């Protein structure tokens, strides 16, 4: 389960910041938080990993918004607000559960759209068109001019249903 969580963190951050390097950095941040089993400030995380505090904060705040790390807020003796970050098994479980829920919703939506209408595909450029779009284009692909072909959706629907059932087990 931990590997799946680390993969989700890495890919999510890499996608958000359009940087595979940031994804790998986020993976290191959450690995550190999980292995140390203690609440750490962003400054301490930055020191442990030898990276800038700004990068650390940016990654941690994104992960917090995605519910992939836990955060605790406390006021210091000199009335400053200090945030500490942590990752535990419950955070990992919830992150995977939330990601599975989003995936199920997308798959369900795709299955619904495939069952509700007929689709045509261009055999050359593989663009997919609804029945209405195919009629509007006269049965010809507007991108490359090739004749559109009807797609039998049952095989795709069956595959997506199996994937949905697998995700539902999580």
UniProtKB/Swiss-Prot annotation:
Domain HTH TFE/IIEalpha-type: 1-93
Gene Ontology process terms (BP): regulation of DNA-templated transcription; transcription initiation at RNA polymerase II promoter
SUPFAM superfamilies: Winged helix' DNA-binding domain
Organism domain of life: Archaea
A Pfam family matched in the record: TFIIE_alpha
HAMAP family: TFE_arch
Subunit-level organization: Monomer. Interaction with RNA polymerase subunits RpoF and RpoE is necessary for Tfe stimulatory transcription activity. Able to interact with Tbp and RNA polymerase in the absence of DNA promoter. Interacts both with the preinitiation and elongation complexes.
Protein family according to the UniProt entry: Belongs to the TFE family.
Domain notes for this protein: The winged helix domain is involved in binding to DNA in the preinitiation complex.
Name of the protein this chain belongs to: Transcription factor E
Species in which this protein is naturally found: Pyrobaculum islandicum (strain DSM 4184 / JCM 9189 / GEO3)
Gene: tfe
């Amino acid at each position: 389960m931990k590997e799946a969580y680390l993969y989700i963190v890495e890919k999510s951050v890499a996608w958000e910041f359009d940087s595979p390097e940031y994804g790998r950095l986020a993976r290191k941040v959450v690995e550190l938080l999980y292995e140390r089993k203690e609440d750490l400030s962003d400054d301490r995380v930055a020191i442990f990993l030898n990276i800038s505090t700004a990068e650390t904060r940016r990654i941690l705040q994104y992960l917090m918004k995605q519910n992939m790390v836990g955060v605790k807020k406390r006021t210091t003796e000199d009335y400053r607000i200090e945030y500490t970050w942590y990752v535990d098994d419950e955070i990992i479980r919830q992150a995977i559960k939330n990601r599975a829920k989003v995936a199920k919703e997308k798959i369900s939506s795709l299955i619904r759209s495939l069952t509700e209408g007929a689709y045509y595909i261009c055999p050359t450029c593989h663009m997919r068109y609804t029945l209405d779009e195919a009629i509007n284009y006269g049965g010809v692909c507007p991108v490359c001019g090739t004749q559109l072909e009807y797609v039998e959706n049952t095989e795709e629907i069956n595959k997506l249903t199996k994937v949905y059932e697998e995700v539902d087990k999580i």
